[in-house]
Amino acid sequence: MKPTTIASLQKCKQNKKRFATITAYDYSFAKLFAEEGLNVMLVGDSLGMTVQGHDSTLPVTVQDIAYHTAAVRRGAPNCLLLADLPFMAYSTPEQAFENAATVMRAGANMVKIEGGAWLVETVRMLTERAVPVCGHLGLTPQSVNIFGGYKVQGRGDEAGDQLLSDALALEAAGAQLLVLECVPVELAKRITEALAIPVIGIGAGNVTDGQILVMHDAFGITGGHIPKFAKNFLAETGDIRAAVRQYIAEVESGVYPGEEHSFH
């Protein structure tokens, strides 16, 4: 199988073909996802909650991300693999570059960082040094203590305009992908249409170029609170492989996420 690349996703955007992505943390699930046609994966700092059992993503280290990135890469050698730079791992451009090198040596194709226009210098430096960057706007879980919890972001004209401005700034600095989390559908549509780069949504409606889900949410392994945007595909299919195939099919057809999974 040919490797999936950033150019592959750019082509999807140009052809208006929605694509599905998922978080992965280990060899076995990565292998299964790849075998069923999920060719874009994220080693997310969500592992702090789903794998390590913390109540936030903040305790996750660069070493944790690198460890899981290496495992996922062994399971899915041809996938486009994104890896989060965790909390306080990119407070300066130099620190970001050093930590990006660590996770890319472990097998990542691209790093994801959370934040707006204040990251422009960092994004530019990484891009100039051959480190592809995925931005992340909206609900950025590393900022949970600022937000006062996990809440929808970008409601109201001023907040929406700010997110659009941030998205354009990240793109201009060289970001090649953008994740939009927990924002109103109307804003997600504005941002997706304004950017030339592919936009991946989670809790942003079905108007983005792609979708991502935390794998545990896709299989109903939530341990309590179920996010509004989550759907348990395993409950409907009774089989993990069939659940993955249904997730892909519903994303590509625009069935998922539906109105019941979206914010306004």
UniProtKB/Swiss-Prot annotation:
Binds 1 Mg(2+) ion per subunit. GO terms for biological process: pantothenate biosynthetic process. It is found in: Cytoplasm. Mg(2+) binds at residues 45, 84, 114. Its EC number is 2.1.2.11. Its cofactor is Mg(2+). 3-methyl-2-oxobutanoate binds at residues 45-46, 84, 112. It catalyses: 3-methyl-2-oxobutanoate + (6R)-5,10-methylene-5,6,7,8-tetrahydrofolate + H2O = 2-dehydropantoate + (6S)-5,6,7,8-tetrahydrofolate. Catalyzes the reversible reaction in which hydroxymethyl group from 5,10-methylenetetrahydrofolate is transferred onto alpha-ketoisovalerate to form ketopantoate. Homodecamer; pentamer of dimers. Belongs to the PanB family. This is 3-methyl-2-oxobutanoate hydroxymethyltransferase.
